[in-house]
Amino acid sequence: FFSDIFNNIENYVFLLIDYGYSEREFYHPERSSGTIQYYKNHKKIKDSLLNQGNFDISISVDFSRVYRIANLFKLQLMSYTTQEQFLLNTNILENSEKITDVFTRNNILKSLLFPTDMGENFKIMILCDHMKSDFIINFKDYRHKL
């Protein structure tokens, strides 16, 4: 997969957004049964045997592994951060003011930003083939966790 992408394009920024963890978190004993999760209507389902075929299946990304693969292709890691940090630093609060219904706006922001929702569970990894020295990403940096 990565070979097909990174060997055939130049001058790019690769943005990976998904559920996931660093290696230490990914293989934590708490997740000894894996990271597979089932969702229906944006709600987690505990019993996957009920309503088979009527839910989404999600498996978390091992971002440390992605980082090691990126190194094989000599890619630069520009950023590794949480969805919360990414969205806050790309002006989600200002942009959300366009949503006039305060209740709706607050529910959307809560879902996207709160650590117990998507804010900490989704990670953002930004890779590129040539680091631009004048391009600075000011997100809270979690690269040390990889």
Listing of model-derived features with the role each one plays in the protein:
Residues 1-146:
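Long, Lys/Arg- and hydrophobic-enriched amphipathic alpha-helices
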